[in-house]
Amino acid sequence: MKLLENHNVILTGASRGIGRGIALKLAEQGANVAFTYLSSEAKAKELEAELQAKGVKAKAYHSDAADYKAAEQLITDVQADFGKIDSLINNAGITKDGLLMRMSEEQFDDVIKANLKSVFNTTKAVQRAMLKERKGSIINITSVVGIRGNAGQANYAASKAGIIGFTKSVALELGSRSIRCNAVAPGFIETEMTAVLDEKVVAGWREGIPLKRGGTPEDVANAVVFLASDWSSYITGQVLQVDGGMLT
């Protein structure tokens, strides 16, 4: 039997990269997937069809998780379309890198809103449904940058570190209702975004990782599936690093 048979999942930011990889792996394990996108409707519809071809229910929602009212509406719409919600995976996020000296207030605020406030919005909106069921798994995608920081990414690091603190607090608040909350912290993950980088630079990054390779979206997705499933039923408030040993 598949790990997530008849499991209904909401996944934010799924049309490309890590989010897309998570969506595909969820469907492979039997989950019905409600996912959000902001930019390309064509890519979203393409993913929707791929997921449905795996024999699960899937639907794309054009929704901005950083907008509180939109997040509330998303949960309402997914409940109407799918019924109960078993897992929420907060993956949506952006980067607007720059050294602190040159970083604008807008750059900082935009990243905090898209990466951190979005997690608050969707988690707050979904908790009522999960409290009613007295069960649920919330999984927040953070980053190794949120653990150790990174020059030129003060805004991004702050948002991802905030997600870790938020995750642990939610785990403490909702644990008595059998609602778990964990985070996944990817390291260097090779996606279409990294494919355009100089190969020598990428090779240097790989060499600095104990496993001597970059990760894949599937590596992250495997961790997410584990945390969404009953195999992790006694795990909450944790940060699972998927980084090839980068921070070891």
Predicted regions mapped to residue ranges:
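Residue(s) in the substrate-gating loop at a strand-loop-helix junction
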Residues: 143
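Conserved glycine-rich Rossmann-like NAD(P)H-binding loop of the short-chain dehydrogenase/reductase
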Residues: 31-46
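Alpha-helical segment proximal to the catalytic Tyr-Lys
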Residues: 128, 172-176, 233
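Conserved glycine-rich cofactor-binding loop
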Residues: 8, 15-17
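Substrate-binding pocket helix/loop in short-chain dehydrogenase/reductase
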Residues: 99-100, 104-112, 194, 205
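Active-site helix of classical SDR
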Residues: 123, 159, 167
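C-terminal helical subdomain
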Residues: 183, 206-231, 235, 244
